[in-house]
């Protein structure tokens, strides 16, 4: 056997030598041509990025930049979490990596501190810090609603006055930031790649893929892509999904529903229709939306989905209560469930059946795009306290942090954690990208009299908005009276 192998090897070597000799001239010619070509090609210089243009003297000699934060989740430090506490958590590690890059670039140390033990009192705590002349904090990262309240209490610098901060850069969220500025000219807070909790606070509809298939319904992804995922199509699916499974004539937690939500659903559906309830005139006076389309939308919701006799709809804060109602979707007895994106991981752990993610529907196909309301208590925004006199320095630091977040926090939070690690299919990944890129800010979304009125409509199933307009307008004017003193509108 060895002799045969040796003979074959000798024959192979002779053949290779023959080929090599016959082709040597061709190889030499090709090599020479390649050398001539490479010699004639000009050397390309590496592409210059924004970070390369940062002035060389933007260094801060080991300064500690302290960020004060507050969210309803006491463990959600998205600014500078302790690495020992986030090791193994892909998002926390990405925040740490972002900070290391920014710290090295600027010669700083980034630190964070919780502003309050109770997230509901953060405005009071910020006021106390400002009145005491506190200068420890370089920036705040707090729920957007509380940041708005801080802005009309004179606690924040207008970001327009920070020359080193450019909110037109790609790493800032342009449309959302314009809405947060009340479509005016004054920015007191900003969102971008630097913070991810606003993405976690985006509203979405979860759907049971197994049940959808079992009912003979098409998964709605293509409808979304084609711009056909509308309120009408959504209601068709809801209508076809409910059933009195035990046949006792009473709908409870043991039966099947088309949609599970709570009384806050109007502040998710209305923004998905592109509707802002609280608006402002060019002089900064608060206005309640009284357009015909707005009233049509309210009527559609109250005569359909919110009708007390409409069995396919289950309100979690209705007679059944949260404890029982919250078993229905995870256990496969509801087609749709409306909530925030941050609930994905919980469903992944609790559900045996596969689920997908969708945006809330458009009102009609003519609506130009989908919108995603986001919870302004959970969703955060960055701002600069009025006691911080180092605006140029702060602007550079926030810009650099946001810039480095593009390749650290964003891919970790969105691509790896939510879109790959948590979501079970690539189609839902596409849906989440759509949600995050189309967040919609509604000032009346949380904490206002308008919010309370919309909750009342949802829980009662009665549209009394028009009849309550006089009292709503009066309260609304009082709530937002200070806006015109801080925000600029018109020309």
Regions found by a protein language model. Name each.
Residues 68, 134-140, 144, 182-205, ...:
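Extracytoplasmic/periplasmic solute-binding protein
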Residues 388-395, 405-491:
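Conserved C-terminal helix/tail region of periplasmic/extracytoplasmic solute-binding proteins
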Residues 348-418:
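Extracytoplasmic/periplasmic substrate-recognition and gating elements
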Residues 15-18:
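C-terminal motif of bacterial Sec signal peptides marking the signal peptidase cleavage site
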Residues 235-240, 270, 275-319:
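Glycine-centered hinge/linker elements that transmit conformational signals in sensory
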Residues 164-172, 223-226, 252, 275-296, ...:
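Short, solvent-exposed loop/beta-turn-alpha elements that line the ligand-binding surface or hinge
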Residues 76-107:
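Short, polar/charged alpha-helical segment
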Residues 105-182:
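Extracytoplasmic "Venus flytrap"/periplasmic binding protein-like
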């Amino acid at each position: 056997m060895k002799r045969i192998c040796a003979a074959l090897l000798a024959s192979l070597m002779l053949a290779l030598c023959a080929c090599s000799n016959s082709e040597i001239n061709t190889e030499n010619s090709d090599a020479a041509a390649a050398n001539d070509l490479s010699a004639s090609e000009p050397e390309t210089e590496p592409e210059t990025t924004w970070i390369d243009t940062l002035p060389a003297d933007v260094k801060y000699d080991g300064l500690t930049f302290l960020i004060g934060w507050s969210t309803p989740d006491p463990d959600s430090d998205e600014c500078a979490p302790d690495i020992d506490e986030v090791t193994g958590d892909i998002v926390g590690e990405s925040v740490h990596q972002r900070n290391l890059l920014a710290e090295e670039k600027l010669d700083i140390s980034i630190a964070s501190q919780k502003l309050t033990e109770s997230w509901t009192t953060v405005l009071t705590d910020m006021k106390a810090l400002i009145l005491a002349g506190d200068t420890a904090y370089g920036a705040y990262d707090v729920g957007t609603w509380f940041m708005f309240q801080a802005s009309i209490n004179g606690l924040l610098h207008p970001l327009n006055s920070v020359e080193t901060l450019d909110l037109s850069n790609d790493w800032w969220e342009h449309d959302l930031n314009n809405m947060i500025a009340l479509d005016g000219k004054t920015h007191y807070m900003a969102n971008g790649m630097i913070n991810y909790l606003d993405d976690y606070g985006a509203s979405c509809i979860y759907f049971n893929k197994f049940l959808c298939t079992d009912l003979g319904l098409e998964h709605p992804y293509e409808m979304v892509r084609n711009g056909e995922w509308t309120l009408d199509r959504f209601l068709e699916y809801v209508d076809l999904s409910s059933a009195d499974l035990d046949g006792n004539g009473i709908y409870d937690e043991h039966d099947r529903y088309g949609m599970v939500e709570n009384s806050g659903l109007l502040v998710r559906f209305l923004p998905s229709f592109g509707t802002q309830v609280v608006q402002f005139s060019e002089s900064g006076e608060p206005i309640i939306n009284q357009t015909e389309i707005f009233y049509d939308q309210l009527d559609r919701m109250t005569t359909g989905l919110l009708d007390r006799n409409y069995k396919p709809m289950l309100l979690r804060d209705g007679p059944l209560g949260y404890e029982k109602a919250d078993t229905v979707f995870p256990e496969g007895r509801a087609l749709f469930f409306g909530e925030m994106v941050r609930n994905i991981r919980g469903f992944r752990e609790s559900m045996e059946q596969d689920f997908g993610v969708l945006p809330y529907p458009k009102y009609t196909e003519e609506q130009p795009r989908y919108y995603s309301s986001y919870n302004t208590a959970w969703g955060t925004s960055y701002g600069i306290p009025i006691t911080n006199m180092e605006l140029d320095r702060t602007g550079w630091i926030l810009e650099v942090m946001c810039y480095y977040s593009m390749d650290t926090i964003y891919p970790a939070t969105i691509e790896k954690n939510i879109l790959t690690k948590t979501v079970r299919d690539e189609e839902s990944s596409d849906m989440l990208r759509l949600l995050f890129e189309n967040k919609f800010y509604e000032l009346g979304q949380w904490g206002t009299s308008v919010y309370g009125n919309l909750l009342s409509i949802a829980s009662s199933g009665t549209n009394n908005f028009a009849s309550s307009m006089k009292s709503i307008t009066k309260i609304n004017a009082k709530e937002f009276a200070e806006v015109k003193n801080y925000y600029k509108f018109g020309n």
